[in-house]
Amino acid sequence: MKNKSTMIMGGALLLLVVIYFATSYNPREVSRGAEPLFAAPQPDIDRIEIVNPKKDDITLERRNSVWFITSPVEYKASQMSIEQMLSALMTTTVDGTISKREEARDKFDVGDTGIIFRAYAGDKKVLDAVLGKHSVELTHTYARLSDSNEISLWRGIFGRQIDRDVNGWRDKTVYSFNPDDIMSLTAKEGSVTRALTLNDTTWVYTENGKEKPIDQEKTRGLVNLIATLNTDAFGEGEDIPRVANNDYDVEVSFSVRNGDTHTFHVWVPEDEGSKRYLVRKVDGDVLFRFFVYRGSQLVIDYEKLKPDDTA
């Protein structure tokens, strides 16, 4: 009798467990296996439109194998940024559908707050999607096609790769030379002229014609910096009044092996709170912004070049 009672109680408990799981399990509305966003053959994308409600609306176009920003400004784009974006796009997989309910758009930022991404191959639109927030694990982006209510999981952090303003897409290259081709550098600041000249394989520093000792390794670091100079950021509205009258603080020039000379002007920070150096090529109109660490090196500061044991 005791064994029979135990069996009845065990059966009742098992039934309760089955009922619990049957009533509490809440599966996703739709689920399917991972599928590539672009099935073979993949499109040759040559134009991209990004509509970002929180930042700039961007148009990127490929011209003769080189990518450019064509709106809201005309400027060469960062080739690496676009190549990485396209690589991520072409390897993106759709890992399942989260919801088909229109009211779920706001929850996943694929409604009015989402980023619209359109891609073209020639005259054909190959993708028109709204990208939303990323998953907690940072492995997926919530997305939906613009003409659909179906909210899906895209594997990868693709949404974060396109969420940037126009300056985030710009090519940050200022100069691109082989450091070995730099023959001399000169900085003119008021009545003081600081110069670095390559004598065979040794750099020589002079200040108003007077030679001073320098650390060769530090000097080569400066030469490498200027030869392959990339900006930290681009000048913005608050910087424009500073350079409006072209009243720069330092003029820096460098010569290369073929005899050409390249010159840029530097505006040093007006106070400690500014912490930014502004740079513009003498024949250019683009204003570059450098933070203190690198900007202070551009003016050929002797204190940064002298040997460590020099007082």
Give the residues covered by each predicted segment.
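A short-motif feature that recognizes glycine-rich, charge-decorated loops
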Residues: M1-A311
